[in-house]
């Protein structure tokens, strides 16, 4: 999108200015917390954690599973499932059009990806929410994918891990969406009865029907640092109760302090700690340890001045 400067500056000057920087576009990303400009290849190497302030940036579902699972032996589950507009829902835009736009922008069919694989050699089933797909909202396909993933875990008696990032139930699917809360809770009860471990990992943000169902039903409830977790958002609560909320209210650190979650794990530790926990839960040999991530942080270069000045 062009800004006011683009409108008043001749295109020739704009192009020459870009050429003088010598920095290709799209190589830098701004940290939403500290405002530092981060070199994308280094940011990816650091698992999308800001090396300046330690802020955990949001990542896509596939990126999340790529970080967490071993490279070999992955199998995507229920990849054929696609959402449909059974209620012919329309608000300011048709639901059918919203789905098409979300599928085009994310490359995913819906807001959940499920895979069977291993992490540090420990077999498991892992799910991850795609927040960029309609806010990671839970509709019929998300609920069905989660249930099928849990059933694979039941069939093979291997643990289930879910990374949540969601605004809640999908309003465009109305009662069909709300039913997924009961549906996912029911299959998790089956896992519990069979003694199959389920670990819930909450990432920024987790709200609504997802936080009120599968996200808070883990045998172990883990969160990333500074993740926003709750049922209604803080602004909605403040407008309702007409009071200022405590500092850090609904952040993972606040929830840990008040006993709502079991632990907070840094993204660098997530894979190793969960693998060790699952190995202990399932009486398997303890996995090894991974080398720490190390690199020198590159500072964003200044705009090169033209020669002769």
Curated annotation (Swiss-Prot):
Location of the CoA carboxyltransferase N-terminal domain:
27-296
Where does the protein end up? Cytoplasm
Output the Pfam families linked to this UniProt entry.
Carboxyl_trans, Zn_ribbon_ACC
UniProt cross-references to PROSITE patterns, sorted A to Z: COA_CT_NTER
Please list the reactions this protein catalyses: N(6)-carboxybiotinyl-L-lysyl-[protein] + acetyl-CoA = N(6)-biotinyl-L-lysyl-[protein] + malonyl-CoA
Q: Which top-rank group of organisms is this from?
A: Bacteria
Question: Where are the C4-type Zn fingers located?
Answer: 31-53
Residue ranges for the region (Disordered) are 288-309
Cellular component annotations (GO), alphabetically ordered: acetate CoA-transferase complex
Q: Which cofactor does it need?
A: Zn(2+)
Q: Which HAMAP family match?
A: AcetylCoA_CT_beta
Which protein family is named in the record?
Belongs to the AccD/PCCB family.
Quaternary context: Acetyl-CoA carboxylase is a heterohexamer composed of biotin carboxyl carrier protein (AccB), biotin carboxylase (AccC) and two subunits each of ACCase subunit alpha (AccA) and ACCase subunit beta (AccD).
Q: Please report the name of this protein according to its UniProt entry.
A: Acetyl-coenzyme A carboxylase carboxyl transferase subunit beta
Biological source species:
Marinobacter nauticus (strain ATCC 700491 / DSM 11845 / VT8) (Marinobacter aquaeolei)
């Amino acid at each position: 999108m062009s800004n006011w400067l683009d409108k008043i500056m001749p295109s020739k000057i704009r192009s020459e200015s870009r050429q003088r920087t010598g920095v290709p576009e799209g190589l830098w990303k701004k940290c939403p917390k500290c405002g530092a400009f981060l070199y994308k290849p280094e940011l990816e190497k650091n698992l999308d954690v800001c090396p300046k302030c330690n802020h955990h940036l949001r990542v896509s579902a596939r990126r999340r599973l790529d970080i967490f699972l071993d490279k070999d032996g992955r199998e995507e589950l229920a990849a054929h499932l696609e959402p449909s507009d059974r209620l012919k829902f329309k608000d300011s835009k048709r639901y059918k059009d919203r789905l098409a736009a979300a599928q085009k922008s994310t490359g995913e069919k819906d807001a959940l990806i499920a895979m069977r694989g291993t992490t540090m050699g420990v077999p498991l089933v892992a799910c991850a929410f795609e927040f960029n797909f309609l806010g990671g909202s839970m509709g019929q396909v998300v609920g069905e994918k989660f249930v099928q993933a849990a059933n694979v875990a039941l069939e093979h008696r291997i643990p289930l891990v879910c990374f949540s990032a969601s605004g809640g139930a999908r309003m465009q699917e109305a009662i069909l969406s709300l039913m997924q809360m009961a549906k996912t809770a029911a299959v998790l009860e089956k896992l519990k009865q069979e003694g199959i471990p389920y670990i819930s990992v909450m990432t920024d943000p987790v709200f609504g029907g997802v936080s009120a169902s599968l996200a808070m039903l883990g045998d172990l409830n883990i969160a990333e640092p500074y993740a926003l977790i709750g049922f209604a958002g803080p602004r909605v609560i403040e407008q309702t109760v007409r009071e200022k909320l405590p500092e850090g209210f609904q952040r993972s650190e606040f929830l840990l302090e008040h006993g709502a979650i079991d632990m907070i794990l840094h993204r660098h530790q997530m894979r190793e700690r969960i693998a060790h926990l699952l190995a202990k839960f399932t009486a398997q040999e303890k996995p090894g340890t991974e080398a720490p991530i190390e690199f020198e942080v590159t500072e964003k270069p200044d705009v090169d001045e033209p020669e002769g000045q």
